[in-house]
Swiss-Prot record:
InterPro entries: Ribosomal_bL9, Ribosomal_bL9/RNase_H1_N, Ribosomal_bL9_bac/chp, Ribosomal_bL9_C, Ribosomal_bL9_C_sf, Ribosomal_bL9_N, Ribosomal_bL9_N_sf. Belongs to the bacterial ribosomal protein bL9 family. GO terms for molecular function: rRNA binding; structural constituent of ribosome. Binds to the 23S rRNA. The keyword rRNA-binding applies. Keywords: Ribonucleoprotein, Ribosomal protein, RNA-binding, rRNA-binding. The keyword GTP-binding does not apply. This is Large ribosomal subunit protein bL9. GO terms for cellular component: ribonucleoprotein complex; ribosome.
């Protein structure tokens, strides 16, 4: 009986690996948990071919997503400055603060493209003025945009 067996994961398994990973596990773990619950399949040449095909498709998809993010970053750079209007009191102090939702709305108004507010990092803004905001477009692509906060 071998000390370790190789299996290909069909789904993410905590502390073991992600979907499509080739991992070595104890035979009992594979036989009693991974294989019966469909979380993994034994390694065969046909399975390895499927895994390689799946990885190639995923790499193509990731490349397309990265290219779209780069194109969107170029569009953001072309626009240059985004404006958020907030109510202010004395000395241009804002009532409240500028949130990442406000910035996402300003980007959406200017580009007609929706962006998740959780991908925007806004410094604490309590006054009108010009600020730099970071937008995460992809795991490898970020953009710095210029944000102008004005009073209305």
């Amino acid at each position: 009986m071998p000390k370790r067996v190789q299996v290909v994961l069909n789904e993410d398994v905590l502390s073991l690996g992600k979907d499509g990973d080739l991992v070595e596990v104890a035979p009992g773990y594979a036989r009693n948990f991974l294989l019966p619950f469909g979380k993994a399949v034994p390694v065969t040449p046909a399975v390895m071919k499927q895994v390689e095909h799946r990885r190639a498709k995923e790499a193509e998809r990731q490349a397309a997503l990265k290219q779209a993010a780069l194109d969107f970053r170029t569009a953001l750079d072309t626009i240059g400055r985004f404006t958020v209007k907030k109510q202010t009191g004395e000395d241009n102090v804002l009532f409240g603060t500028v949130t990442n939702g406000d910035v996402a709305e300003a980007i959406q108004d200017a580009t007609k493209k929706e962006i998740d507010r959780r991908d925007i990092v806004v410094p604490e803004i309590h006054r009108t003025g010009k600020y730099s905001v970071t937008v995460k477009l992809h795991s490898e692509v970020t953009a710095e945009i210029n944000l102008e906060v004005v009073s209305y």
